[in-house]
């Protein structure tokens, strides 16, 4: 059976922790930032843990994990 490919969009956007949680960077950070408050932009920093259901979907797209 051939090897399964990892979706390249998943490689770019997500990270899997050692405990199996999936981290994703928040959206709405590229343009039109002047319309958002400073508080909203500040709270949008860092990574967020995906829900369990979304994490399972991401793990299906990355069958061998993400390094």
UniProtKB/Swiss-Prot annotation:
Q: Supply the PROSITE patterns for this chain.
A: RIBOSOMAL_L35 (PS00936)
| Cellular component, GO annotation | ribonucleoprotein complex; ribosome
Please report which protein family the annotation says this sequence is part of: Belongs to the bacterial ribosomal protein bL35 family.
Question: Which top-rank group of organisms is this from?
Answer: Bacteria
Protein name (Swiss-Prot/TrEMBL): Large ribosomal subunit protein bL35
**What gene is behind this protein?**
rpmI
Molecular functions (GO terms)? structural constituent of ribosome
- A matching Pfam family: Ribosomal_L35p
- Compositionally biased intervals (Basic residues): 27-44
Q: Does the keyword Ribosomal protein apply?
A: yes
Q: Which organism is it from?
A: Granulibacter bethesdensis (strain ATCC BAA-1260 / CGDNIH1)
What GO biological process terms are annotated to this protein in UniProt?
translation
> Is Ubl conjugation one of the keywords?
no
Q: What is the lineage of its organism?
A: Bacteria, Pseudomonadati, Pseudomonadota, Alphaproteobacteria, Acetobacterales
**Region Disordered: what ranges?**
22-52
Q: Which InterPro entries match?
A: Ribosomal_bL35, Ribosomal_bL35-like, Ribosomal_bL35_CS, Ribosomal_bL35_sf
**Keywords of this protein's UniProt record, alphabetized?**
Ribonucleoprotein, Ribosomal protein
Where is coiled-coil annotated? none
């Amino acid at each position: 059976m051939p090897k399964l490919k990892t979706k390249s969009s998943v490689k770019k956007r997500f990270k899997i922790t050692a405990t199996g949680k999936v981290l994703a960077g928040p959206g709405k950070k590229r343009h039109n930032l002047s319309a958002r408050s400073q508080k909203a932009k500040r709270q949008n920093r860092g990574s967020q843990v995906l829900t369990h259901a979304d994490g399972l979907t991401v793990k299906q797209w990355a069958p061998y994990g993400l390094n």
